UniProtKB/Swiss-Prot annotation:
It catalyses: S-ubiquitinyl-[E2 ubiquitin-conjugating enzyme]-L-cysteine + [acceptor protein]-L-lysine = [E2 ubiquitin-conjugating enzyme]-L-cysteine + N(6)-ubiquitinyl-[acceptor protein]-L-lysine. The lineage of its organism: Eukaryota, Viridiplantae, Streptophyta, Embryophyta, Tracheophyta. Its EC number is 2.3.2.27. Its main location: membrane. It comes from the Eukaryota. This is RING-H2 finger protein ATL74. One of its GO terms (cellular component) is membrane. It is an enzyme of class 2 (transferase). The chain crosses the membrane at residues 35-55. The RING-type zinc finger domain mediates binding to an E2 ubiquitin-conjugating enzyme. It comes from Arabidopsis thaliana (Mouse-ear cress).
Length: 159
């Protein structure tokens, strides 16, 4: 039916081999090529989304981590117990018994006052107000400044 309309629109003075059917064939080829291209793009999109989902699931489940690294990240999320907190040294700011390089607590951003009790973390020597760092270490097991794990220090120091 479509071909009849095309031939009648042309006026009928064209010969059958001169191109009356060529435009129709060209349109059909263009439509078929467009469908193939769109189908290939859709398949590529679905494949990419599937691979992304698989990778995210694998990372979430921890397949990308070794067993020791996975244990370390779980331990870093857990805090320290109160009796472990008491093992960290406490110094009096300004007394000169322990050299404290910092002048302010990195947690509350308050300056240390002379005579104030400051807790010094052994592996990195960062200093904090006792109340600030104790609150932090109840829910974390790393230094808030440098993220150095404090669990390794206790394991090595307790033996």
């Amino acid at each position: 039916m479509h071909r009849l309309l095309l031939e009648s629109h042309g006026g009928g003075n064209e010969t059958s081999g001169s191109g009356g059917g060529d435009g129709y064939t060209r349109d059909m080829n263009f439509d078929a090529n467009m469908v193939i291209i769109l189908a290939a793009l859709l398949c590529a999109l679905i494949l990419a989304l599937g691979l992304n989902s698989i990778l995210r699931c694998a990372m979430r489940c921890g397949f990308g981590l070794s067993s020791s690294a996975a244990a370390g990240t779980v331990a870093d999320r857990a805090g320290l117990k109160k009796r472990e907190l008491k093992k960290f040294p406490v110094a009096e700011y300004g007394s000169g018994e322990v050299k404290i390089a910092a002048t302010e607590c990195a947690i509350c951003l308050g300056e240390f006052a002379d005579g104030e009790r400051v807790r010094v973390l052994p592996p990195c020597n960062h200093s904090f107000h006792m109340s600030c760092i104790d609150t932090w270490l109840v829910s974390h097991s790393s230094c808030p400044n440098c993220r150095h794990s404090l669990i390794e220090v206790h394991v090595a120091g307790s033996e």
